[in-house]
């Protein structure tokens, strides 16, 4: 590609709507990295005569980052939605053989090609909203062959689509039916066979565990973290979603990239996360969809300076959501985040939750030129509108990969 000077734009380079430039320009090198950003009046002489692209006064933000998804799976769980409307809880449905395990059955039965095609349909609307990086977890196979198939599909999505895909091995997502009553033995399988094999195949960027009374204990979760550490892999945790089990403090002890959900997080967990630099990933779509009533401790997170990220948590059972903009709206309306917190939560802080701050979440010299173009008057509109397509253009590595006539 050729070097380009993008101009006539309003720039929010670091995901903070309180830190912007009204008349800005972005110089992008031929290799797709950013050469310079700043005021249009300050363009260095070396870039002034580069070919230009006029963005007609639109806002530019870093490409959005969806840092927690379960995008690859078989089937759907609309029947459970009806059960919840009739009064059944998430835990009750799981105890009846529904929940995660029902998706495990559908995923095990699906071919790799079928999983790929279904995942493509879920990914496309996210890309059209300006998402340029996404995390995709396994965890609906719960045995080696199916977990491998899920992670292979995630890698294929990154090859087919203009999006950076970060894979997370979530073998410790639920107890498979064949291991009923033998959770410790299943953790043996996860740590001694599944993780080593998948890591050796280059399919794993990070390791996650569902630490909850319907998931795995602290001791079992720690075994998974130890196995990840032996492989030099970063960890993250589904923690404190349904109860306060101390998972966030354990995650912090292992310097986890993130602890996610966190409705029942307490002050000790918040302090531990602050000390370890662990990002709090909040998932308002799941909170809304399962009609949770316990809010995450937003004020505690703010007071301790814990970075807050937002993600869709796309999954078939508790958050069949394919809109990061709607997630921003929910973060503001349900969790009472500010627009500033919401936008940082899907850019800079979301990148930190993936351990990818050097590549995503901010527009600075040397980083990938991944950005989204928004023909709006104020960045608050990104969280204000819902159900309305706002993104006019997506640029990935300096190349336009999506356009919509939004004016």
UniProtKB/Swiss-Prot annotation:
It comes from the Bacteria. Keywords: Cytoplasm, Histidine metabolism, Hydrolase, Iron, Metal-binding, Zinc. The keyword Iron applies. Zn(2+) binds at residues 68, 70, 238, 313. Fe(3+) binds at residues 68, 70, 238, 313. It catalyses: 4-imidazolone-5-propanoate + H2O = N-formimidoyl-L-glutamate. 4-imidazolone-5-propanoate binds at residues 77, 140, 173, 241, 318. Its EC number is 3.5.2.7. Binds 1 zinc or iron ion per subunit. Its cofactor is Zn(2+); Fe(3+). GO terms for biological process: L-histidine catabolic process to glutamate and formamide; L-histidine catabolic process to glutamate and formate. N-formimidoyl-L-glutamate binds at residues 140, 315, 317. CDD domains: Imidazolone-5PH. Pathway: Amino-acid degradation; L-histidine degradation into L-glutamate; N-formimidoyl-L-glutamate from L-histidine: step 3/3. Catalyzes the hydrolytic cleavage of the carbon-nitrogen bond in imidazolone-5-propanoate to yield N-formimidoyl-L-glutamate. It is the third step in the universal histidine degradation pathway. Belongs to the metallo-dependent hydrolases superfamily. HutI family. This is Imidazolonepropionase. It comes from Burkholderia pseudomallei (strain K96243).
């Amino acid at each position: 590609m050729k070097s380009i000077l993008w101009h006539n734009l309003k720039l929010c380079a670091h995901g903070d709507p309180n830190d912007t430039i009204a008349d800005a320009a972005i110089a992008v090198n031929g290799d797709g990295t950013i050469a310079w950003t700043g005021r249009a009046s300050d363009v260095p002489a070396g870039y002034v005569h580069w070919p230009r692209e006029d963005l007609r006064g639109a806002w530019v933000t870093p490409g959005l980052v969806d840092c927690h998804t379960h995008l690859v799976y078989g089937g759907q769980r609309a029947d459970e939605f009806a059960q919840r409307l009739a009064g059944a809880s998430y835990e009750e449905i799981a105890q009846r053989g529904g929940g995660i395990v029902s998706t495990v059955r559908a995923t095990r039965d699906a071919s790799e090609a079928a999983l790929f095609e279904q995942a493509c349909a879920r990914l496309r609307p996210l890309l059209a909203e300006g998402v340029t990086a996404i995390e995709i977890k396994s965890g609906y196979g719960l045995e080696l062959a199916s977990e491998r198939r899920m992670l292979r599909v995630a890698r294929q999505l990154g090859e087919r689509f203009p999006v950076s895909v970060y894979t997370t091995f979530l073998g410790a997502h639920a107890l498979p039916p064949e291991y009923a009553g033998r959770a410790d033995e299943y953790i043996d399988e996860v740590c001694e066979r599944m993780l080593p094999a998948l890591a050796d195949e280059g399919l794993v960027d990070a390791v996650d565990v569902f630490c909850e009374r319907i998931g795995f204990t602290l001791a079992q979760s720690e075994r998974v973290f130890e196995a990840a550490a032996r492989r030099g892999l970063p960890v993250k945790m589904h923690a404190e979603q349904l109860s306060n089990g101390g998972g966030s403090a354990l995650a912090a002890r292992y310097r986890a990239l993130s602890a996610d959900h966190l409705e029942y997080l307490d002050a000790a967990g918040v302090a531990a996360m602050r000390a370890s630099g662990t990002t709090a990933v909040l998932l308002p779509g799941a909170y809304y969809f399962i009609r949770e009533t316990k809010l995450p401790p937003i004020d505690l997170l703010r007071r301790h300076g814990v970075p807050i990220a937002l993600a869709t948590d796309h999954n078939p059972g508790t958050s069949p959501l394919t809109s990061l903009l709607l997630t921003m709206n929910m973060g503001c309306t349900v969790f009472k985040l500010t627009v500033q917190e919401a936008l940082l939560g899907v850019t800079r802080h979301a990148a930190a939750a993936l351990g990818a701050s050097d590549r995503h979440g901010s527009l600075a010299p040397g980083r990938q030129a991944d950005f989204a173009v928004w023909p709006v008057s104020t960045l608050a509109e990104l969280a204000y509108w819902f159900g309305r397509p706002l993104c006019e253009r997506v640029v990935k590595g300096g190349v336009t990969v999506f356009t919509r006539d939004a004016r």
